[in-house]
């Protein structure tokens, strides 16, 4: 059961007895589970914890909610908040975190139609666009947020984006007709726009022609509102500003003085809103011979001039956002670019109130996407807001497919009487091609993904930016504060600006931030949250260089900044989008449903001659000469496949070499290939080998995430070096590369809208969750999954999702079709003794050494004699059996049993460690280095981060060089000559923890060493659990367990202490 569910159960208990946890503490824990690290506080950015909710009627018979809330960390001071009128319908519960907006000079807080605002889950930032779109249909807004990125690109969207950019550049420069024409041409030549034209199969000329139709309106608007002249000559409008002392509209002349910012990014922790304002303008309002200057939002629209409630609502919300940076603008502007018509949009209390209520309902729907009939019962997906009865709105809705699919698969409303009649037929029409098994697959994976995204580790929002000072957060290693800009900002291209920062005072702190990390840049001043997003380009002890999406040179030079790592662990938009695509009524989706959900048998071609071109036979034969028999068998199986092939890459069997050979053979045969994996490093490892064979390929993805030796093959670098500025040249680039490489998350690239590959190869497929792995498969006729389900599965944090089957990869799911499976069994990593462990535990003797040299290889210790002499200093240890056995190169495997030492574990602050094991690891590491083993050839593995930290600290204080200390997961796919494994757990109550119960992690740990493997732990504690019991049976039979004798325990501290002082 997840922690949040356990808390719900406890909260239901009426009497917990004397030892019961106080109810207030349970509510606080529930709040922490929903929003980790929230700090309760009063003031402008107040955060209150709801302790109790009572619904009652006032003296007039109207319903109101009485909330008992507290903002004190010790929860001793309780405050009453009364919600009246429409606010009483807000779905607030005990344990929720809320923000109260208004005046509370005397208690209680009273929030009603006329005064104050109530913000539910204020640390959940929701875009103003999403709130505005929920006006007509809340269901659509929830679906758009849930299936983010599934909205198809359109011609209108592209033209709108281009027009926005032309206007935004012009307002900072000039609206002269000839300059507008230049700006339009420049913008159309930007590679990012050329890519969208390619996606939509449009030409530059037709887009330019349409853009040019708007340009005269741009000039006219500027002539009306930005020219020089007396105030009486500026356009007159009706506008009310409460700060003038009147709420009535009265005529005034409007002069737009200048543009102050473009795409100003504002996050509001007061209102739980975020957004980017198209243009922030300085405006003079001339009325009755008086002038008032205001900084106001200007929203640009390229569609039909409707002055609709959605459009006006966006402007109202931007006025709320503007209050985070400056005084209340009280109104904003709505400009339709086609006509040049600009409308004033007053932001009155009523409009803001109703929009914030909508925002609360949207936040509640997004947060509570999983429900239970009762605490402790099985999770299920919550129903979405009701389907509306508005045929016209639904007809043009981009989420109609997902709406119908969710209704059928999750809400099971195929013939529900509650659905409007007009929509019932639409739901059936959208989903009639789907069978029950397809709907169940969709529903199950939606549930599992949602559970995973709502785990505490994935719930962390960005609230630390506004709730925790940078000086405090720096200790976590994920933030650097007190930064100032040092050099002029340089423009890489539109949307990419290079910024250099250094510490205002002192050197850079120790940090986990490194090149390639996503970051959010904010000002340390309260009003400057989330100014820009981007990546760390370069970082050292003196300075940090960042590539940001906005040019911040307009901010004062004295502005002090902070960088926060952007965590994106809980983002499920891509896998949910893939699931939605799998349910579409298209041929690729239908075929994948048959293979993956219905388990249709994969088909194969009978004769190799029918797929192997005559002129490629010699090339293929030469490539095959360098492969072993299982690898050659894999090549044949792939060439004969009509659907898919699974290649099982057992440890050390040359998986990367096999994939490289496969790509070369497919290329020689004239096939196009899409090469993917989950990580950039896995993709680049293959490409590094391909590059040595002079095989051409196109690498998609941002250059700074790609291996330095592969960057010259990226689309970004090629476009830059060739100065690509036309669609014809971009198409030529795409068409000239039959081999394309990207990660599984990069499948939204425009190239895939018009290109289908003959083969898709997915490396590390057994580590990728099914919906993520699906993405690239839509764009190929056949696919090859390479992996090993006996090694690490997809990482799943949520226990319930794991129990439902989320850790089953597509590789594992399809492995039941044995005709499609080829096993690589000849390995070139481990010597015979180390290999025998994995053969016994996992592979049923299938693994074999590739040569006698591999089988008999031992750890090279050129200075072993000197090391043994130095150990003579410790007379009691010089001839100890365990130490002699460990150091002996001809003993490749040994388990050091700590039962008699003793070596008890420590559990503190949720972390598990074992200091004695850590000290032993450091002692052994130091001894092997003295014996001549290079620090770079040694790897230390431990299952717990706390243990890793202790070992790393001890190594840092010793004379030992740079030795890699990491978890099993980080060592997947890699090896070292010497591996030392600390199992950590040593207790009498049988507690082992989830990590050590996973036999696949154990298998990975046992197969990382090439020449020597040293395991360290408590046999009595570990043997209770399979497969560790099986491991000990084998080790005992081979006499590979060495007991650390009790008589040596007394001297152990002395020896280890001396070791660290050396």
Curated annotation (Swiss-Prot):
One of its GO terms (biological process) is DNA replication. Acetylated by EP300, leading to stimulate the 5'-3' endonuclease, the 5'-3' helicase and DNA-dependent ATPase activities, possibly by increasing DNA substrate affinity. This is DNA replication ATP-dependent helicase/nuclease DNA2. ATP binds at residues 649-656. It catalyses: ATP + H2O = ADP + phosphate + H(+). InterPro entries: Dna2/JHS1_DEXXQ-box (IPR026851), DNA2/NAM7-like (IPR045055), DNA2/NAM7-like_C (IPR041679), DNA2/NAM7_AAA_11 (IPR041677), DNA2_Rift (IPR048459), DNA_replication_fac_Dna2_N (IPR014808), P-loop_NTPase (IPR027417), PDDEXK-like_dom_sf (IPR011604). Residues 82-520 are annotated as: Nuclease activity. It comes from Mus musculus. The lineage of its organism: Eukaryota, Metazoa, Chordata, Craniata, Vertebrata. Its EC number is 3.1.-.-, 3.6.4.12. Belongs to the DNA2/NAM7 helicase family. It is found in: Nucleus; Mitochondrion. GO terms for cellular component: chromosome, telomeric region; gamma DNA polymerase complex; mitochondrial nucleoid; nucleoplasm. The gene is Dna2.
């Amino acid at each position: 059961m997840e922690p949040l569910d356990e808390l719900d159960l406890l909260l239901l208990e009426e009497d917990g007895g004397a030892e019961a946890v106080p109810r207030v503490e349970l509510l606080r824990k529930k709040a922490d589970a929903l929003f980790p690290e929230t700090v309760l506080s009063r003031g402008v950015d107040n955060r209150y914890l709801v302790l109790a909710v009572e619904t009652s009627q006032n003296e007039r018979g109207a319903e109101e909610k009485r909330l008992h809330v507290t903002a004190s960390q010790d929860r001793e001071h309780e405050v009453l908040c009364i919600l009246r009128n429409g606010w009483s319908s807000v779905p607030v519960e005990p344990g929720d975190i809320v923000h109260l907006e208004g005046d509370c000079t005397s208690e209680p807080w009273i929030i009603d139609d006329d005064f104050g605002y109530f913000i539910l889950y204020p640390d959940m930032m929701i875009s103003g666009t999403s709130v505005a779109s929920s006006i007509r249909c809340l269901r659509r807004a929830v679906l758009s947020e849930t299936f983010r990125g599934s909205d198809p690109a359109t011609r209108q969207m592209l033209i709108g984006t281009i027009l926005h950019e032309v206007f935004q550049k012009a307002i900072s420069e000039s609206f002269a007709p000839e300059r507008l024409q230049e700006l339009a041409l420049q913008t159309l030549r930007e590679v990012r726009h050329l890519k969208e034209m390619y996606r939509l199969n449009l030409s530059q000329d037709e887009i330019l022609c349409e853009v040019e139709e708007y340009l005269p309106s741009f000039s006219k608007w500027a002539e009306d509102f930005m020219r020089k002249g007396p105030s009486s000559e500026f356009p007159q409008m009706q506008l009310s500003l409460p700060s003038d002392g009147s709420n009535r509209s009265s005529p005034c002349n409007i002069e737009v003085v200048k543009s102050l910012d473009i795409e100003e990014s504002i996050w509001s922790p007061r209102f739980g809103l975020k957004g980017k304002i198209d243009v922030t303008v300085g405006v003079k309002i001339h009325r009755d011979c008086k002038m008032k200057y205001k900084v106001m939002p200007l929203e640009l629209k390229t569609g039909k001039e409707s002055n609709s409630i959605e459009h006006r609502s966006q402007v109202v919300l931007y006025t709320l956002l503007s209050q985070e940076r400056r005084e209340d603008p009280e109104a904003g502007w709505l400009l339709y670019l086609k006509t040049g018509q600009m409308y004033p949009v007053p932001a009155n209390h009523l409009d803001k109130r109703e929009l914030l209520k909508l925002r609360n309902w949207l936040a509640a729907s997004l947060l509570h996407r999983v429900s239970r009939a009762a605490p402790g019962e099985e999770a299920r997906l919550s129903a979405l807001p009701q389907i509306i009865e508005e045929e016209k709105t639904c007809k043009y809705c981009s989420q109609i497919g997902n709406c119908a699919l969710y209704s059928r698969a999750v809400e099971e409303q195929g013939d529900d009487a509650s659905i409007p009649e007009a929509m019932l037929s639409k739901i059936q029409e959208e989903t009639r091609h789907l069978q029950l098994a397809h709907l169940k697959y969709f529903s199950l994976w939606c549930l599992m993904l949602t559970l995973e995204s709502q785990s505490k580790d994935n719930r962390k929002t960005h609230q630390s930016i506004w709730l925790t000072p940078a000086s405090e957060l720096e200790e976590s290693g994920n933030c650097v504060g007190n930064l100032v800009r040092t050099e002029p900002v340089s423009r890489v291209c539109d949307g990419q600006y290079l910024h250099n920062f250094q510490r205002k005072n002192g050197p850079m702190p120790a940090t986990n931030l490194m090149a390639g990390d996503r970051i959010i840049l904010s000002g340390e001043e309260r009003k400057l949250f989330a100014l820009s997003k981007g990546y760390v380009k370069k970082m050292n002890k003196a300075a940090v260089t960042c590539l940001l999406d906005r040019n911040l040179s307009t901010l004062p030079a004295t502005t002090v900044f902070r960088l926060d790592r952007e965590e994106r662990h809980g983002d499920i938009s891509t896998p949910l989008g893939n699931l939605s695509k799998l349910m579409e009524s298209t041929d690729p989706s239908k075929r994948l449903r048959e293979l993956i959900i219905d388990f249709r048998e994969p088909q194969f071609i009978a004769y190799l001659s029918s797929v192997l071109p005559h002129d490629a036979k010699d090339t293929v034969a030469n490539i095959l000469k360098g492969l072993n028999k299982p690898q050659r068998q894999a090549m044949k199986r792939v060439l004969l496949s009509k659907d898919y092939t699974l290649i099982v890459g057992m440890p050390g069997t040359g998986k990367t070499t096999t994939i490289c050979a496969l790509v070369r053979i497919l290329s020689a045969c004239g096939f196009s290939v899409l090469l993917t994996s989950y990580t950039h490093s896995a993709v680049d490892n293959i490409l590094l080998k391909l590059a040595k064979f002079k095989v051409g390929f196109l690498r998609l993805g941002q250059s700074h995430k790609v291996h330095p030796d592969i960057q010259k093959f990226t689309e970004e670098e090629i476009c830059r070096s060739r100065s690509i500025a036309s669609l014809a040249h971009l198409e030529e680039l795409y068409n000239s590369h039959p081999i394309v490489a990207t990660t599984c998350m990069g499948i939204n690239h425009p190239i895939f809208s018009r290109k289908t590959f003959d083969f898709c190869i997915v490396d590390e497929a057994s580590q990728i969750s099914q919906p993520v792995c699906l993405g690239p498969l839509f764009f190929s006729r056949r696919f090859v999954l390479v992996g090993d389900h006996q090694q690490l599965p997809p990482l799943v944090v949520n226990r319930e999702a794991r129990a439902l089957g989320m850790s089953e990869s597509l590789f594992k799911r399809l492995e039941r079709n044995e005709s499609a499976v080829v096993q690589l069994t000849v390995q070139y990593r481990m010597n015979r003794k180390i290999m025998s462990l994995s053969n016994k535990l996992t592979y049923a003797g299938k693994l074999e050494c590739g040569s006698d040299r591999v089988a008999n290889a031992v750890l090279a210790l050129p200075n072993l004699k000197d090391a043994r002499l130095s150990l003579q200093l410790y007379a009691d240890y010089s001839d100890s059996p365990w130490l002699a056995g460990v150091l002996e190169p001809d003993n490749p495997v040994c388990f050091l049993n700590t039962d008699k030492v003793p070596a008890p574990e420590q559990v503190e602050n949720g972390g598990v460690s074992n200091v004695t094991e850590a000290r032993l690891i450091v002692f052994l590491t130091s001894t092997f280095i003295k014996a001549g083993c290079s620090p770079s050839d040694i790897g230390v593995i431990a299952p717990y981060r706390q243990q890793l930290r202790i070992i790393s600290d001890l190594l840092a204080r010793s004379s030992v060089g740079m030795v890699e200390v990491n978890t099993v997961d980080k060592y997947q796919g890699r090896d070292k000559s010497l591996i030392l494994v600390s199992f950590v757990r040593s207790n009498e109550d049988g507690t082992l923890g989830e990590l050590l119960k996973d036999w696949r992690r154990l298998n990975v740990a046992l197969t990382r060493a090439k020449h020597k493997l040293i395991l360290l732990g408590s046999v009595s504690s570990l043997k209770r659990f399979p497969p560790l019991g099986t491991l000990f049976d084998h080790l005992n039979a081979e006499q590979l367990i060495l007991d650390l004798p009790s008589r040596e325990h007394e001297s152990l501290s002395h020896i280890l202490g001396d070791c660290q002082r050396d």
